[in-house]
Structures are given as structure tokens and as C-alpha cells.
Amino acid sequence: MKRTFQPSILKRNRSHGFRTRMATKNGRYILSRRRAKLRTRLTVSSK
């Protein structure tokens, strides 16, 4: 049986990346919450 998780960096960044988060109001809210928690990585695309 084929596994469900087939990793793709491009798809990952397009759905969860920084620019995608910044594009919507809710995405910006997520980033603000992560900043408030002092997360070192705000999104999956940030190094």
C-alpha cells in the first residue's frame, strides 16, 4: 500500500509558506500568534 505522506517542498511552501500566510488576514493572525509565543520558525519556509 502506498503511504499517504509524499513530501514535496514546493507544495509545502505554497500551502504553509510565509508569503501564503501574509496573503490573508487569518494567515497574518497565525504569524502574530507565533511571534507572541517567540517561535524561532514562524513558517515552514523560514530557515
UniProtKB/Swiss-Prot annotation:
NCBIfam families: rpmH_bact (TIGR01030). The keyword Ribosomal protein applies. GO terms for molecular function: structural constituent of ribosome. Gene3D superfamilies: 1.10.287.3980. This is Large ribosomal subunit protein bL34. GO terms for biological process: translation. Pfam families: Ribosomal_L34 (PF00468). It comes from Buchnera aphidicola subsp. Schizaphis graminum (strain Sg). Keywords: Ribonucleoprotein, Ribosomal protein. InterPro entries: Ribosomal_bL34, Ribosomal_bL34_CS. Belongs to the bacterial ribosomal protein bL34 family. GO terms for cellular component: ribonucleoprotein complex; ribosome. It comes from the Bacteria. The keyword Ribosomal protein applies. HAMAP family: Ribosomal_bL34 (MF_00391).
